[in-house]
Amino acid sequence: MKRILCITGTRADFGKLKPLLAYIENHPDLELHLIVTGMHMMKTYGRTYKEVTRENYQHTYLFSNQIQGEPMGAVLGNTITFISRLSDEIEPDMVMIHGDRLEALAGAAVGALSSRLVCHIEGGELSGTVDDSIRHSISKLSHIHLVANEQAVTRLVQMGEKRKHIHIIGSPDLDVMASSTLPSLEEVKEYYGLPYENYGISMFHPVTTEAHLMPQYAAQYFKALELSGQNIISIYPNNDTGTESILQELLKYQSDKFIAFPSIRFEYFLVLLKHAKFMVGNSSAGIREAPLYGVPSIDVGTRQSNRHMGKSIIHTDYETKNIFDAIQQACSLGKFEADDTFNGGDTRTSTERFAEVINNPETWNVSAQKRFIDLNL
């Protein structure tokens, strides 16, 4: 029996990890241990740990790693301490983390420093913020890489990672997107009390390196949404530095045409996204999930500036007029053909590709002592 310790810190990463967590939980030779922390535990963001515990995983650990406004460095330290103590107790064979959040960095650090295998999902990607540095740091602490596409493979090889330890599995959330068990739009509207026939979705997160400018950017952004006259479904920003100023502005604009939620269940969010007129903000969902559904999206500012921009994506700066104009353009475009460029075009599900890796004995024989692989210089 192999024990895998996984960590989820946000509504977003849990939604993406769910298919893989279900596979591990139901595997006769694997034992899932899941830490639920970060935004999941915070009242401001809807205490989404309840969404995780609803899945009834056999081994789940709830940990509140921060108080509102606590510095990110302190939160990282809190998280490392908890994961380290739990890891010593349960002795996992592998630590599995996702993405570029500090909870993932904490898990990778603990795994690497305790000579346990670290498996990183969706490394090798680019955005446009400090998240890049965190993601690449996690990759350098990891032994096994489960990436979305060939571009990610190339970047990890450039970073000195061994090619045979990098596996393309696509993006796991796309398994959820293609699921036949998603609720209907009518069910979602009834659950959240949404009266709109037509609407756009807004997700606007802080950029930590621009935190001092977030009050100005947030004011300009939400003013543009109001001026557009569109019905807007907005989701609260994540809890990175600068979130308070965004949330303060967001709450000013709540009205019959602007409804905000601390969180929306991932599957329900996907249904809303699929039927939206457009998506606007700086979330990766506008770069990845929206194009797969053919939904036009407006990417605002620098947070996603280094990611692949498909033909359904309109990029703009933080100026109110430019955001307003981009929304008008998106509304005039209608739906696009589905774009699965990010996923590499493989017809297999991410879960199938994940199973291939996790059931391979060679995966478990990877040395915990990493070597830097030089390019041919």
From Swiss-Prot:
GO terms for biological process: carbohydrate metabolic process; UDP-N-acetylglucosamine metabolic process. It is an enzyme of class 3 (hydrolase). One of its GO terms (molecular function) is hydrolase activity, hydrolyzing O-glycosyl compounds. Its EC number is 3.2.1.183. It comes from Neisseria meningitidis serogroup B (strain ATCC BAA-335 / MC58). This is UDP-N-acetylglucosamine 2-epimerase. Belongs to the UDP-N-acetylglucosamine 2-epimerase family. Keywords: Hydrolase, Isomerase. Changing E122Q: Strongly decreased activity. Catalyzes the conversion of UDP-N-acetylglucosamine (UDP-GlcNAc) to UDP and N-acetyl-D-mannosamine (ManNAc). The active site is at H212. It catalyses: UDP-N-acetyl-alpha-D-glucosamine + H2O = aldehydo-N-acetyl-D-mannosamine + UDP + H(+). Gene3D superfamilies: Glycogen Phosphorylase B. Coiled coil: none annotated. Changing D100N: Strongly decreased activity.
